[in-house]
Amino acid sequence: MASVAVEPQLSVVTRVANLPLVSSTYDLVSSAYISRKDQYPYLKSLCEMAEKGMKTITSVAVTSALPIIQKLEPQIAVANTYACKGLDRIEEKLPILNQPTNQVVANAKGAMTGAKDAVTTTVTGAKDSVASTITGVVDRTKGAVTGSVEKTKSVVSGSINTVLRSRVMQLMSSGVENALTKSELLVDQYLPLTKDELEKEAKKVEGFDMVQKPSYYVRLGSLSTKLRSRAYQQALCRVEEAKRKGQETISQLHSAFNLSELARKNVHNANQKIQDAQDKLYLSWLEWKRSIGYDDTDESHCAEHIESRTLAIARNLTQQLQTMCHTLLSNIQGLPQNIQDRANHLGVMAGDIYSVFRNAASFKEVSDGLLASSKGQLQKMKESLDDVMDYLVNNTPLNWLVGPFYPQVTESESAQAPGTTRRPGRWSRKHPKPVPVSNAEGSQPDDSSS
């Protein structure tokens, strides 16, 4: 005997939502909301941001409550069966639930119009009687429609309240509360308070006022605003730090280039005495070392030693400048393409300057033309850094405010061997890496090398 397939029973919430009267009312409200949103662009952007936040929170709530729902699935199925039976009886008593809103209104209008036409055509002389008859029909129709709608509202409200008071919904609410609290803690941990927020917190502590705990929706909106503001401030601080280090390195490289020019003019000038050239070069070397915070008066002051140390430090500084440029480029994603192209050009110029000193063993291998062009490139880099920072301060990138605030794994990180620890990549674009430098050339000499 062939087995009969049993159709899965719909949940009571799905059945209530699928009722023609409920679904048609929802469609009317939804269409009114969409039309209003399309009429006002600013309202549309705010509504879309709110919808996106609600979708994220709903996804977190569903994920948190899924194990609990699966555990209580038998009890939920039994409760759903009883609720569906009760809904069946209600639908039998109230056929209006299976009619859409426009049909209910049309039927009411049709009944009133038919009664009016029948009374008008048959008894034209009895105006008072016709008027009273029409009034009675209208009142009875309105009473029937109003009573049906009120009963439907009471049934739906009662069902919703019953579900909300159930243990399952209480557990779900608890899960959502825990998820929101955890999100707030993570934001405070990874995105510390800004100066303005610290001042507000200090004022709250001084007042000792009892503040009532805000509602769930207020906390949700505050979390979204807090996340956007702190993420923007942190990104701005990273770019400011990159700019500061870059300008310091550029200033030190200017001094190194000036020292190189001085060495070329004095050491290799046959018209001057060698001893005078060495003394003058040594004094300039000491002055530059003190300006960058490196001072050791015990080392040799021969021209060859100063020459090798100057070239080594110049290589180290140009490598630092190259690394800083790539760090800056990785932190300004979301800015207009012309700003990103300018930052990318900074890295190219830093690589060109580094190539000048990379393989140079003496000042003879660095011509005056290369030094002059390198100094010009340093000045252009300083101006570009100022332009990028000015744009960031005066123009906030929109996608830095609305997200997404999540790391994207780059190709090099996805190919990394398992088990290794590395910070998550911030952007998906691959950037050129600075040229590696050996310890003998790239690092600043220490006292032992003297």
UniProtKB/Swiss-Prot annotation:
Main localisation: membrane
Subcellular location: Membrane; Lipid droplet
Chain spans, region Disordered: 411-450
Topological type in the membrane: Peripheral membrane protein
Post-translational modification: Acylated; primarily with C14, C16 and C18 fatty acids.
Tissue expression notes: Milk lipid globules.
Pfam families: Perilipin
Ranges annotated as biased composition (Polar residues): 440-450
Domain of life assignment: Eukaryota
Function: Structural component of lipid droplets, which is required for the formation and maintenance of lipid storage droplets.
Protein name, as recorded: Perilipin-2
Species per Swiss-Prot/TrEMBL record: Bos taurus
